[in-house]
From Swiss-Prot:
One of its GO terms (molecular function) is molecular sensor activity. SUPFAM superfamilies: Nucleotide-diphospho-sugar transferases (SSF53448). Coiled coil: none annotated. This is Mannose-1-phosphate guanylyltransferase regulatory subunit alpha. Changing residue 247 to D: Does not instate mannose-1-phosphate guanylyltransferase catalytic activity. It is linked to Alacrima, achalasia, and impaired intellectual development syndrome: An autosomal recessive disorder characterized by onset of alacrima, achalasia, and intellectual disability at birth or in early infancy. More variable features include hypotonia, gait abnormalities, anisocoria, and visual or hearing deficits. The disorder shows similarity to the triple A syndrome, but patients with AAMR do not have adrenal insufficiency. It holds the Pfam family GMPPB_C. Residues 356-384 are annotated as: C-loop. Regulatory subunit of the GMPPA-GMPPB mannose-1-phosphate guanylyltransferase complex; reduces the catalytic activity of GMPPB when part of the complex. Mediates allosteric feedback inhibition of GMPPB catalytic activity upon binding GDP-alpha-D-mannose. Together with GMPPB regulates GDP-alpha-D-mannose levels. Belongs to the transferase hexapeptide repeat family. Changing residue 334 to P: In AAMR; drastically reduced protein expression; reduces allosteric inhibition of GMPPB; fails to rescue phenotype when expressed in a zebrafish disease model.
């Protein structure tokens, strides 16, 4: 028996994802046509012996999240439950707080996946590796170049046994080109070190004149409090993958993740990819079109385009490297490149909405997405263009490298701007 836990965070996280996270929780943002964490759930559901999937986070269980859980249970015929933390507890605190729920039924092991990663999720391969050695912690690792490795948790392994000898979260100097993917497989014994951290936090925070539990004791950081502390003690091992992997920290990285997932659909979900048919729009490369979307026959879509529910795409529209969300309208002859068009937004005829791609260096096979700040030296860095919810763009204007917050009605062109 196996279980899976998906760590979805809370509203205080994902600030780099704004304005898109204003409308839906970041884990429910559509990537390649389906909510971000549906890719995780699909991968978990395919593992033989999977009995339950738990989501742990600090979001309020609102209507979108509740509807998603109900739909996921129906589609995958598995219990999918949300466990809400009483406070943000870090990457390990929720696991310890809900340990009884996780261990109910005595699972052999349980997967732990961060919601904000894009991957092909080699969970079956991880399970095979775990069953060969049965150590408490198994981490999925991949490689990054020397410079970008400093932005991740870095792993020094024994190349023969794959034991993690040293772990440093976001080191200041180069440690290793092997990085933590945020995807783990834990045995039930893995919760014992979390208990030790909780008890140590309790002792450190306990005041002599304040009996009772210290409220901060439940905050546990897997990476710093557990992995770094236990590295080199024969408890943590790494399983390396050369498959697709990327973090989804910003809107630009969501667009890149959409491309990766759309390319995987050729093997995993070919039915989700649009095909060129007589009388239909021109399709170039990998494109997802929701069945309820209305797309004019003269529109040209792709590559890497995702069109959501109820979208209207007019005659002569050109769409490339973009996500168009639920209910948006692209009027005749608009051009949308490297952009995300928000829910219910309208782009007027002959308007152009364009961003600058922020993809990894194509000449470096180990390059990863950079999650840089929006600004450098007081100037907005060129990046993809984002239109928030219900933005109205007039006809014949250019919106370039800009972020438009929700419910704005523009009257002219903008370049390199954040429109508040």
């Amino acid at each position: 028996m196996l279980k899976a836990v998906i760590l979805i965070g809370g509203p205080q996280k994902g600030t780099r994802f704004r304005p898109l996270s204003f409308e839906v929780p970041k884990p429910l943002f559509p990537v390649a046509g389906v909510p971000m964490i549906q890719h995780h759930i699909e991968a978990c559901a395919q593992v033989p012996g999977m009995q339950e999937i738990l989501l742990i986070g600090f979001y309020q269980p609102d209507e979108p999240l509740t509807q998603f859980l109900e739909a996921a249970q129906q589609e995958f015929n598995l219990p999918v439950r949300y466990l809400q933390e009483f406070a943000p507890l870090g990457t390990g605190g929720g696991l310890y707080h809900f340990r009884d729920q996780i261990l109910a039924g005595s699972p052999e092991a349980f997967f732990v996946l961060n919601a904000d990663v894009c991957s092909d999720f080699p969970l079956s391969a991880m399970l095979e590796a775990h069953r060969r050695q049965r150590h408490p912690f198994l981490l999925l690792g991949t490689t990054a170049n020397r410079t970008q490795s400093l932005n991740y948790g870095c792993i020094v392994e024994n190349p023969q046994t794959h034991e993690v000898l040293h772990y440093v979260e976001k080191p200041s100097t180069f440690i290793s080109d092997i990085i933590n993917c945020g995807i783990y497989l834990f045995s039930p014994e893995a919760l014992k070190p979390l208990r030790d951290v909780f008890q140590r936090n309790q002792q450190d925070g306990q005041l002599e004149d304040s009996p009772g539990l210290w409220p901060g004791a439940g905050t546990i950081r897997l990476e710093q409090d557990v992995f770094s502390a236990l590295a080199g003690q024969g408890q943590i091992y790494v399983h390396l993958t050369d498959g697709i992997w990327s973090q989804i920290k910003s809107a630009g990285s969501a667009l890149y993740a959409s491309r990766l997932y759309l390319s995987r659909y050729q093997d995993t979900h070919p039915e989700r990819l649009a095909k060129h048919t007589p009388g239909g729009p021109w399709i170039r490369g990998n494109v997802y079109i929701h069945p309820t979307a209305k797309v004019a026959p003269s529109a040209v879509l792709g590559p890497n385009v995702s069109i959501g529910k109820g979208v209207t795409v007019g005659e002569g529209v050109r769409l490339r490297e973009s996500i168009v969300l639920h209910g948006a309208t692209l009027q005749e002859h608009t051009c949308v490149l490297h952009s995300i068009v928000g829910w219910g937004s309208t782009v007027g005829r002959w308007a152009r909405v364009e961003g600058t791609p922020s993809d990894p260096n194509p000449n470096d096979p180990r390059a990863r997405m950079d999650s840089e700040s929006l600004f450098k030296d007081g100037k907005l860095l060129p990046a993809i263009t984002i239109l928030g919810c219900r933005v109205r763009i007039p006809a014949e204007v250019l919106i370039l490298n800009s972020i438009v917050l929700p419910h704005k009605e523009l009257s002219r062109s903008f370049t390199n701007q954040i429109i508040l």
